[in-house]
Amino acid sequence: MAGSFAQLAKNAEKKKPSISVSKEPVENPPLKVYQLGDEALRTPANRIVKVDDAIRKLAKDMLITMYSSKGIGLAAPQVGIQKRLLVIDLKFEDPNSPPMVFINPEIISSSATLDTYEEGCLSIPGVYLNVLRPSSIKLSYRDEMGRPKKMNADGLMARCIQHEIDHLNGVCFVDKVTDEEELKKQLNENNFKRSDVIKETN
């Protein structure tokens, strides 16, 4: 009977609700994406104490907003909500690829190997610049049902997670750009101010 109870528990786990949304863009996304220069992007987010329907609704609205902007990642501070929540979908054009929801994500460790790759951001449209980051990370977080998870990520997933976690800490990717000339050029071309960039000192 123990085996039967274990199987029932496993099946019940599978039947728990998860977040499912269409990846088709909508004309009026539910959330506004704030842009560089707004204080919302510079305010550190708060930990989520309880994962409930309200948090799942927020994650769903964030996904709809992200898909409508053809993005692959979005953090709650980008939509003016200071909660430690982010959503990612590297295959936003694949309707069969499920998105990922990260609640209270924390990087446990990161590789000594660093990679440079071009990044962009829904909060800084039109700006694409190289950023140096660890090539792989180990992460702890909770999923949309509040279940504790750990994962290893490398490549684009590792980069996207790091980029979005930066947002949770009030950091934008342009803060990490070392090519000052190209930074100023692209910011100016896209009507952003260099004074809104907070350069990292470490």
UniProtKB/Swiss-Prot annotation:
It is an enzyme of class 3 (hydrolase). Binds 1 Fe(2+) ion. Its EC number is 3.5.1.88. It comes from the Bacteria. One of its GO terms (biological process) is translation. Its cofactor is Fe(2+). Belongs to the polypeptide deformylase family. Removes the formyl group from the N-terminal Met of newly synthesized proteins. Requires at least a dipeptide for an efficient rate of reaction. N-terminal L-methionine is a prerequisite for activity but the enzyme has broad specificity at other positions. This is Peptide deformylase. It comes from Prochlorococcus marinus (strain NATL2A). The lineage of its organism: Bacteria, Bacillati, Cyanobacteriota, Cyanophyceae, Synechococcales.
